Amino acid sequence: MSIEVFNESGYDGVNEEALIDVAQFALMRMDIHPAADMTISIVDEPTIEDLHVRWLNLEGPTDVMSFPMDELTPGSGRPDADAPGPAMLGDIVLCPAFAERQAHRAGHGLGHELSLLTVHGILHLLGYDHVAPEEERRMFALQNDILADWYTDLEERGVSYGPKPTGPGAFPTAADREALDQDMIKSTVGGMLAEPTDRDKS
């Protein structure tokens, strides 16, 4: 399983090793075939804003976007599954500048926020969505389970990319995230989001 990270954001504080680790864990947890590949692109706000408008017709920057390619479904890595051969899952695009402000409002650090967004993006690559309320609840519950299990797995391996956050925004429900989205929108001043203070980049 190959996961490539392309950091074109010029943003400090992005732990690429952690992103690869959580992505590999999520794909294994979803039983994705080990021959599958994906990329993680890390970009600045103007770039993701352009993608947001061009692909979703939504103004303003965002935290994560997913661009699926080959269709792989959960369970494709099981011994009894048909062997699909090498496949390119697609690309996840992350914006750390936006994500850091979002993390500040949620009460945790950039590292955890990017890990959460990586899992979220992978679930989108695998066909999960949150348009309908029930789908949204199911997707966010799965996202939180994967993320929590990843922290447990890190502890068992003796690896740490920062402490596991315990605040209410660390493993959000769909309703929690919707409230955060609204808070981010309200914080927009003159087209730019207000910068947080005293940020934890772990």
UniProtKB/Swiss-Prot annotation:
CC cofactor: Zn(2+)
Pfam families reported for this sequence: YbeY (PF02130)
Residues annotated for Zn(2+) binding in this entry: 120, 124, 130
BP GO annotations: rRNA processing
Gene Ontology CC annotations of this record: cytoplasm
Subcellular location: Cytoplasm
Keywords: Cytoplasm, Endonuclease, Hydrolase, Metal-binding, Nuclease, Ribosome biogenesis, rRNA processing, Zinc
Any one GO molecular function term: zinc ion binding
Database matches in HAMAP family: Endoribonucl_YbeY
Described function: Single strand-specific metallo-endoribonuclease involved in late-stage 70S ribosome quality control and in maturation of the 3' terminus of the 16S rRNA.
PANTHER family in UniProt: ENDORIBONUCLEASE YBEY, CHLOROPLASTIC (PTHR46986:SF1)
Protein name in the entry: Endoribonuclease YbeY
Lineage: Bacteria, Bacillati, Actinomycetota, Actinomycetes, Mycobacteriales
